[in-house]
Amino acid sequence: MLDIPLSESLQHPGTRVAVNIIISIAAIALVRVIGSRWLTQYHLRALPLVNGLGLFESGKRAKGSFLFNAQGLLDEGYAKSSKAFRVQTDSEQVVVLAPECASEIRNDDRFSFTNLLAEDFLAHIPAFVNFSPHNGLNDMANDVITKKLNPALGLVTPDLSAEATLTFRDHWTDSTEWHSVNVKGTILEIVARLSSRVFLGPELCRNPAWLRITVDYTTNLFFGVVALKKWRSFLHPLVWRFVPEVRKVRQQIEEAIQLIQPVVDKRHAESRSSAASSGKKDQTLYDLCSYPEYIEPLRDELVTVLKESGMTKAGLFKLKLMDSFMKESQRFKPGAMIMMRRKVMEDVTLSNGVFLPRGVQVGIPLRSHFNPKAYSDPDKFDGYRYVKMADDPEKEVFRHFVTTSQEHMGFGFGKHSCPGRFFAANEVKVALCHILLKYDFKLAEGPKPNVMKMGWVLISDPMTNLMIKRREGIDESILE
C-alpha cells in the first residue's frame, strides 16, 4: 500500500475536485435546510407566535412554557387570533387552526397524519422506526383492525368477558372488605390482559414479561422521544444510542419480538397442518366516583340489558346510558388539548384566508367540546346528554361513543379517526359491566384526582386510589 502524506494527497487534482464537490453538496444541503425553514417562517409571519423568543433568549424558555403551560398558550392564542396562531412546541412550531377548520381538512390528502407521526416521533431513529410512513406498518395495522378485528367484535366479546373475570379477581380481588387499589396501575394491567387476550390469545395474555412490556412501552416511548428532543436535531442520529430512555425502548422492542415469535411460529405450524383503551377506563371511573348518582341507573341498565341479550356485541350496543356517560366523560377530559394534528404536504390556503406553507404542522383545538351552539349548558357534566339526543333526528347519529364529529373529536375526525375505537368501546363496556356489577367503589381519602398536563397531552392522575369491595348476592351469570 502506498503511504502518501495527507498534504500531498490534497494537492492531487482529482482529490481537490472530490473535496470541492463534497463541500459544495454539503453547502447546498445546508442552504436548502436553512432556506426552507426561513421561507416557512416568512410565510407564517402573519400568524401570532404566542411563546416567541426575545433577542437574547434561548429556546429552553419556549419549550418549557409549552411542556408545562400549553393550555395557557392556547388561551393566549385564542385572545390574539380567531383564525390561527402559532405555538412553539418542544420540537416544532405548530399552527393551531380554528375549530371550524376541522370539516375542511378532515379528508384532505394534503394534510398527512402518517408524516406527522413520523416527524413527531422521530421515525428516522432506529428505536422509533415503527412510526415511519415507508415501512407499511401503519397500513398493515389499519387493515388488521378495520378488516379483521372490527368485523369480529361479536366473536371476541365472550373472550373479553371471560378474561375480565380472571383479571379483576387477580388485581381487585374478591374481598368483601373495603381495600385500596391504585386506579392507573391496576387499570393499565387489566387493559393489557384484555387486549392481549384478543390480539395474542391465552399463550401470552397472562405472561408477566409480556404484560410488563405492554404496560410500560407507551410511557417509555413518550419519555424516550422527549429525552431525545432535548438534543439538537442534527445530533439525534449520533446520540440516540446513548440516551437511556431511548435504549430502553429499543430493548423492549427486542424483548417483545422474542416473546411473540414462538407464538407466531406455532400458529403458522398449526395453520399448515390444518390447511387487539386504558385512559378511557380510569377517567370514566374517576367520573363515576365524582358523580355517584349515575352508578345505580347504570347497574339497573346493564342487568336489564344483559339478562335479555347476554354479554354480546348486540347487548353492549343496547347500553345507551353507559355509552352516553362514557362519551360525556371523554368530552370533558379527552386525551389531548388539540386533535387532528397533521403535516401539510403542499402549500394550502384555507377558506378563511390562512396560508399554510408546505412542511408546517397544524392541529385543531377541542374548544368545540364546550361550544354552547352545539351543547346546552356545555360546562355541566350530564351523563344523560347523549341519551337525550335520540329524540332529535338531526343529532341522533352523533350520540354514539364511537361516532366522531366536529363537536366531539375524542377519537379524531375524518379519514384518520381512530380505527380501533369500536374495539376500545367494547372493551371499556365489558370492563365497566364487571366493575359495576361486582364492586362497590369510591375515591380514597385525599386530594381529588387532577388531570396531569405534558404539552398537549392530558393524563389521568396516576396517584389516585380507589376504595373497593366485592358486592355480595349478585347474579354473575349475566356476564358470561
UniProtKB/Swiss-Prot annotation:
It comes from Arthrinium sp. Its EC number is 1.-.-.-. Signal peptide: none annotated. This is Cytochrome P450 monooxygenase atnM. Heme binds at C418. SUPFAM superfamilies: Cytochrome P450. Cytochrome P450 monooxygenase; part of the gene cluster that mediates the biosynthesis of the meroterpenoids arthripenoids. The pathway begins with the HR-PKS atnH that catalyzes two chain-extension steps to form a reduced triketide, which then primes the SAT domain in the NR-PKS atnG to initiate three more cycles of extension to give a linear hexaketide corresponding to the polyketide part of arthripenoids. The chain crosses the membrane at residues 17-34. It comes from the Eukaryota. GO terms for molecular function: heme binding; iron ion binding; monooxygenase activity; oxidoreductase activity, acting on paired donors, with incorporation or reduction of molecular oxygen. It holds the Pfam family p450. It is a single-pass membrane protein. One of its GO terms (biological process) is terpenoid biosynthetic process.
